[in-house]
Structures are given as C-alpha cells and as structure tokens.
C-alpha cells in the first residue's frame, strides 16, 4: 500500500511540474515580411512569425501569398500580397488587408481556390500584434487577414489566429494612426513587397 501511495505521489508531482501546453506560446515555423508604403512613401517593414505546427494549412496559404509562388488564381490575378492595400483600419482594434483581387474587402482568394475551412481556434486573440484570418462567417477563409492592435477576445472561436508580429510593431502603430472609426484609412497604405525570410 505504501508503494502505491509513493508511486501515485511521484506521478502527481511530475504532472504538476510539467509545463502546460495551453500556457506555451505557439511554435514559430516560418517568417515572412511586408514592406509597407503610405501614400507611395516607404514606411518600413513588418516581419511575422507563423504558427505552422498549430495551423499548417492556414500558414501555408499566407506564406505562399507572401511569396507569390503559386502564380495566377481563379480570378486571373496573381496570388500575391505585393501591391495590395490595407482597406480597413480601425484604431484600437485592427488593421485589415489581403484583398488583392478587388482591393475593397469584397474579394481575395486562397491558394486552395476561393475559400477554405476554419482550421481550428486553438490560439486566442490575447495580445496586440496577432495575425488572424478575416472572414465572412464560418469556413470562408480566403486571403484577407488582420493584425490586432489590442486584445480582441470577442473574436475567439470565429477567426483563426496563425501568427504574430515579431518585428515592426511600430509600423503597425503607424498604420493604425491613419485609420478611422468607419475603417476607411486617411491615406493609401499598401504592401509594396512581401516574401519569406
């Protein structure tokens, strides 16, 4: 009986001491970048770390759209973020872009075709600088994304977080400063170049 108690105590202490998976930061598997222009003037670079172990399909979509390696999409436009605009910027909320087909938030497409399903919602919108998929409801992911500028926990379970800003949060803040409550930016902000590091 003593042996069982000792073994049980050791197991419980070991389990208690093990780090929790939920408390860990997601593993960054890829790094990509956006070079930003505001009113045709270089503003700087944002570098993102992508969580490819947690949401591999979503990460592969974004990574490939950063490089443009997939060529033309079903829309006849390049599957590439280069030269696309940030069409919606709301201070104290987020910066949205990725509509390279229409430029106004009504378009975009994924490397898998028009839309793809939500992969999972394991990562929460728990801090500024997170990269998440913009969508029009469940399972409608394309190419549009947003970068949080505050905690946005009300989006948990509705939008897939797949990366974070690892360099250039000052550029994110600069973009945020040209936003409005309606979401219409006061200046033209675009991705002049994008790729993988």
From Swiss-Prot:
Keyword Transport included in the entry's annotation: no
BP GO annotations: protein folding
Keywords tagged on the record: Endoplasmic reticulum, Isomerase, Microsome, Rotamase, Signal
Entry-linked Gene3D superfamilies: Cyclophilin-like
PROSITE patterns according to UniProt: CSA_PPIASE_1, CSA_PPIASE_2
Endoplasmic reticulum found in the keyword field: yes
Protein family according to the UniProt entry: Belongs to the cyclophilin-type PPIase family.
Protein name: Peptidyl-prolyl cis-trans isomerase B
Record-listed E.C. numbers: 5.2.1.8
Catalytic reaction annotation: [protein]-peptidylproline (omega=180) = [protein]-peptidylproline (omega=0)
GO CC, any one term: cytoplasm
Top-rank lineage group of the source organism: Eukaryota
Location(s) in or outside the cell: Microsome
InterPro entries documented for this protein: Cyclophilin-like_dom_sf, Cyclophilin-type_PPIase, Cyclophilin-type_PPIase_CS, Cyclophilin-type_PPIase_dom
Task performed by this protein: PPIases accelerate the folding of proteins. It catalyzes the cis-trans isomerization of proline imidic peptide bonds in oligopeptides.
Activity regulation field: Binds cyclosporin A (CsA). CsA mediates some of its effects via an inhibitory action on PPIase.
Domain PPIase cyclophilin-type: 33-196
CDD domains in alphabetical order: cyclophilin_ABH_like
Annotated transmembrane regions: none
GO function terms (MF aspect): cyclosporin A binding; peptidyl-prolyl cis-trans isomerase activity
Signal peptide span: 1-22
């Amino acid at each position: 009986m003593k042996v069982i108690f000792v073994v049980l105590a050791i197991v419980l202490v070991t389990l208690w001491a093990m780090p929790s998976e939920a408390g860990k930061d997601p593993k960054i598997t890829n790094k990509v970048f956006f070079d930003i222009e505001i009113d045709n003037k270089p503003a700087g670079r944002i570098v993102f770390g992508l969580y490819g172990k947690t949401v591999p399909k979503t990460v592969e979509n974004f990574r490939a759209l950063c490089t443009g390696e997939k060529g033309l999409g079903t829309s006849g436009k390049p599957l590439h973020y280069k030269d696309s605009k940030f069409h919606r910027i709301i201070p104290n909320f987020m910066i949205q872009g990725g509509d390279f087909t229409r430029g106004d938030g009504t378009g975009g497409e994924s490397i898998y075709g028009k839309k793809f399903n939500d992969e999972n919602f394991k990562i929460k919108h728990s801090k500024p600088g997170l990269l998440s998929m913009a969508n029009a409801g469940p399972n409608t992911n394309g190419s549009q994304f947003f970068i949080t500028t505050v905690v946005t926990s009300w989006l948990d379970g509705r939008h897939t977080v797949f990366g974070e800003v690892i360099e250039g949060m000052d550029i994110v803040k600069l973009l945020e400063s040209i936003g409005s409550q309606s979401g219409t930016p006061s200046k033209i902000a675009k991705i002049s170049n994008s790729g993988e590091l």
